Structure formats: structure tokens, C-alpha cells
Amino acid sequence: MSGSVAVTRAIAVPGLLLLLIIATALSLLIGAKSLPASVVLEALSGTCQSADCTIVLDARLPRTLAGLLAGGALGLAGALMQTLTRNPLADPGLLGVNAGASFAIVLGAALFGYSSAQEQLAMAFAGALVASLIVAFTGSQGGGQLSPVRLTLAGVALAAVLEGLTSGIALLNPDVYDQLRFWQAGSLDIRNLHTLKVVLIPVLIAGATALLLSRALNSLSLGSDTATALGSRVARTQLIGLLAITVLCGSATAVVGPIAFIGLMMPHMARWLVGADYRWSLPVTLLATPALLLFADIIGRVIVPGELRVSAVSAFIGAPVLIFLVRRKTRGGA
């Protein structure tokens, strides 16, 4: 390990943790109406009864926690997906998991009128699980292992079909369209904490599972044959990883909608900072992705309050960063 990577690793986790704390604080303080820190502290401590405290507790706190939860889930899911498919361009939408969750939520709203947090979460998990099973069955090969190429092709094809069906159902049902048009664009505009309580435990379990897979992912990143030779149980790692992706993507999609791009970009940034060792890159991804999502949400709230979606802002911020990382890697490999 080079000295520069060792130094970067020593400062990356505490530095990103500080950045995440700053993003969380700013998310509570800044919006269409900026609030003093004293009001935020009083609201969080339960000693304030003013209208400003209502803004903090009913609007900013839920969306801040949603950004933390969904950001961490999407970042870890992206890192897992890039390893399972051995595709550096993979993101949580590549295997059709996001599309499956979105389709199931829209279908539930159109056919059964599902709109509560529990109902949407159940539909999101069901859709994500069915999509994962279809893709895994299509992408499987001998020995129970998954073929990265077949997995990617099956995921892209399934996502295209489900996205078309989702759009068709929403357009043919005005009530569903009005209910879900902002959600489908990706938004942290969560108005209560109950929605987050529903997904908290599944996300924590799946996130912890992803972190525990770090050693196995290091072996798997070298290829299935090499991982098997090193004693890694490839099929088991792939199955557990796919289940973790399903839970992480299903939970995030149920809460904030299908937010793309950050699950693609942040694992690249993490590997650029601390190297390809997943024991380091996964924790860095877990800290950096929510920070980016919160900063994107803050910018959207300030520029066009209530209209500019966080998914658009995160893509606008992240695209130049991803281009920089790709060009730097290309030059380094030249």
C-alpha cells in the first residue's frame, strides 16, 4: 500500500464523518426560510412551540433523516452491484431492482389504492424481490454462480420493460400520476417520521450485511475463478449481496423514489480516495453518499423551493466529478 493511500485512509473516514455532520446541520438550518441554530436546537430538545419549530420537526428533520437513510442505502447498493456485475458503470437501477420497486408501488396505487408507508414498502420489497429473482434466474450459470454479463443484460432489459409499464400505468391513471409524479422524479420531501421508521430496521440489517461482506467482495472483485481458488464461497456471496441490494434499493425507492446516479458515482469516488479494498471503500461510500444527497437537497431547496428535485441536482453536481475521476483513472492507466 502506497504512503499516499495510507495517509488518505487515515483522514478519509473522520473527514467524511465531519462533512456528513455539517451537511446534516445545514439541512436543518437552510431552506426557503433560514432558521437560527437556537431554534433548531430548541425544536430538537422539545422546548420550543413556535411555528419555526414546526418547520424543523415536520419538514426538515424528516427529509434530513430520509437523505441519510436513502443515501447510505443507495451508495452501498451501488458498490455491491458494481462488484457482482464486475461492471464499473453499474448502479442500483442496472439490475432492474429500482424499476421493480417503482413498478410495484405504482401498480399497488393504481389497482388497490395503496398510499401508506407500510403498503408502499411492502409493494416496493415485493417488486424489488421479484425483479431480483428474475434477473438472478436469467443471469445464473453452472454451479449456482451468476454470470456478470448475463446479469447485466437481463437487468437492463427488465428495467426497460418495467419502466415503460410504470409510465404507462401512471399516464393512464390521473390520480396515480398526480400522487406519484414528484415521487418518481426522486425527492426527499418526507412529511413524517413514520415512513422512515418502517424502513429503518431493514436498511440497518442490509447495510450491516454489506459491510460484513467486504472481505468476500475483495476476493470476488478478482473474478469468480480466483475467488473460488482463494476459498471464497462465490455463489453464497453473490446471493447474499443480491438480497442486500434488493432490501437497500427497495427501502430507498419506497421512501424517496428512484434516485439515480449517486449509486454509480460515489463508489468510484470512494475507491479513488482509499483504494479498491472494500474494507475501506464501503465505509467511505456509506459516509459520502448521504452527504452528497443532503447537499444536493439543500441546493434544490434554496434555488427553487419545492420544485427542483434532489435527483436532478445530485446528477448536476456529480456528473463533473465522475468525469474527473474517469479521466484521472484513464490517465493513470495510460
Give the location of each predicted region.
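Alpha-helical transmembrane segments in inner-membrane proteins
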Residues: 1-334
